[in-house]
Amino acid sequence: MNRRLKNYLSVGIFAFFGGGLRAYLNLIWSQTGTLTANIIGCFLLAFFTYFFVEYREGRDWLVTGLSTGFVGSFTTFSSFNLDTLKQLESGMNSQATIYFFSSIFIGFLFAYLGMLVGKRTGRKLAEKA
């Protein structure tokens, strides 16, 4: 199978699971589903990125599928903005401000943690290979 087709299929398959998991999170945590998905996604995207940089054994289709497919469909910038806008429109200005800034701060923190864990895990596997 050619490389481009593998990447497209990988994105589609992983997106199915990422989108499904996000829909499930929104069902069980209707108020915090978007925030939870985005924070987990920040960790995962950084983890996958730095893991495969260190490990160097990643297949293009796997890296593309996990990052663009799974994490891309799991997280949502548009819902984050819409949630903030709805809170502002409802007069919940304090809650909207807290939601907005905590999403950015906590997301950055989890991306940083994902980077650290991804680097460490990738290095350990690379040493064993």
Swiss-Prot record:
Looking at the UniProt record for this protein, which Gene Ontology cellular component terms does it annotate, in alphabetical order?
Answer: plasma membrane
Localization per record: Cell membrane
Question: What topology in the membrane does the UniProt record assign?
Answer: Multi-pass membrane protein
Entries under InterPro entries matching the protein: FluC
Q: Name the HAMAP family on file.
A: FluC
GO BP terms, alphabetized = cellular detoxification of fluoride
The annotated modulation of its activity is: Na(+) is not transported, but it plays an essential structural role and its presence is essential for fluoride channel function.
Q: Which organism is it from?
A: Lactobacillus johnsonii (strain CNCM I-12250 / La1 / NCC 533)
The record lists its disulfide bonds as none
Q: What is this protein called?
A: Fluoride-specific ion channel FluC 1
Sorted alphabetically, the keyword list is: Cell membrane, Ion channel, Ion transport, Membrane, Metal-binding, Sodium, Transmembrane, Transmembrane helix, Transport
Positions annotated to bind Na(+): G72, T75
